[in-house]
Amino acid sequence: MTNMRKSHPLIKIVNHSFIDLPTPSNISAWWNFGSLLGVCLGLQILTGLFLAMHYTADTTTAFSSVTHICRDVNYGWLIRYMHANGASMFFIFLYFHIGRGIYYGSYTFMDTWNIGILLLFAVMATAFMGYVLPWGQMSFWGATVITNLLSAIPYIGLTLVEWIWGGFSVDKATLTRFFAFHFILPFIITAMVMIHLLFLHETGSNNPSGMNSDSDKIPFHPYYTIKDILGVLFMMIALMSLVMFSPDLLGDPDNYTPANPLNTPPHIKPEWYFLFAYAILRSIPNKLGGVLALAFSILILMLFPILHLSKQRSMSFRPLSQCLMWMLVANLMILTWIGGQPVEYPFIIIGQLASVTYFFTILILMPSTALMENKLLKW
């Protein structure tokens, strides 16, 4: 008699995805982030569900309802801070996951990569709308500034912005619809994750060498299940340390002031994980140009498969490309720092230089270095 996990229609799918999945024997800890992102998503949906039970999406009571969650609901403070800091963990892992994909050439799995980029956009949209919900000063002004960027779109811009707002400013209608979208998007993300995995399992995982690993595969369980559990353990230690000891470390103090349309905060800025894109947006002194640069800073990921000119898939054996990769990482850190600084000298010029370097590295330096490496290896 066949084992139930191999014959049952539903359990069979789980078996082929997480138990008997043939996996390269040499994948490193950089391959842990997929499962960590899955755990993060589950955690966010769970904590978010409990928060939604006590939250009210109304401009007059939203701020007080969050205060009520933290003060009166049993372990409400824990749920709230796990949700807020869980989002930060989510983005840390997302950026590591994408960085891993770039370093090891995983973007050659075109379907998986493109669905991944769509997932990134969906997660960014969800996080942005979630930041608006507590209805603090930074929530309100962040929503106003970011939605207002759409008015840069020629001809339909203004109509589009007012349509999103549901009025002539960010108000009750905006908050209600943002809550509705913030609630539904994680479930859409979950469905997209399944498609992401479906495409990945069509080809099988990449590995650090970038070479075909069909001749050396091992079952996912128990080898990688135990490795993933260790990753989850480290993640939970990091997350709970953050939640218990400094829950507001990554937040903005301005968001502890209720939203006031008559009082603008001195520095309007998004959460830390959007600062690199915000710096690119601010580095161009033209509204439409800034919006296009902002969009392209993420959309540029779609060009990686086209810009891959090396004969080798992975960067493991390409020291020059490795230098550029780490230069890009340092550049993104500089952009993140600049995004949180006021718009004044010398931050303006540093931001502009870092933005130019970001695009120049990806579009010109990396492909030309790949060609040079081919030449050096007489390929």
Curated annotation (Swiss-Prot):
- The portions of this protein that span the membrane are 33-53, 77-98, 113-133, 178-198, 226-246, 288-308, 320-340, 347-367
What keywords appear on the UniProt entry? Electron transport, Heme, Iron, Membrane, Metal-binding, Mitochondrion, Mitochondrion inner membrane, Respiratory chain, Transmembrane, Transmembrane helix, Transport, Ubiquinone
CDD domains in the record, alphabetically?
cytochrome_b_C, Cytochrome_b_N
Give binding positions for heme b b566: H97, H196
Q: Which cofactor does it need?
A: heme b
Source organism superkingdom:
Eukaryota
Q: What is its main location?
A: mitochondrion
Q: Which GO terms describe its biological process?
A: mitochondrial electron transport, ubiquinol to cytochrome c
PANTHER family per the UniProt record, alphabetical: CYTOCHROME B (PTHR19271:SF16)
Subunit (UniProt) = The cytochrome bc1 complex contains 11 subunits: 3 respiratory subunits (MT-CYB, CYC1 and UQCRFS1), 2 core proteins (UQCRC1 and UQCRC2) and 6 low-molecular weight proteins (UQCRH/QCR6, UQCRB/QCR7, UQCRQ/QCR8, UQCR10/QCR9, UQCR11/QCR10 and a cleavage product of UQCRFS1). This cytochrome bc1 complex then forms a dimer.
Similarity comment text for this entry: Belongs to the cytochrome b family.
Misc. remarks from the entry? Heme 1 (or BL or b562) is low-potential and absorbs at about 562 nm, and heme 2 (or BH or b566) is high-potential and absorbs at about 566 nm.
Q: Per its record, how is this protein called by name?
A: Cytochrome b
Where does this protein come from, organism-wise? Ctenomys tuconax
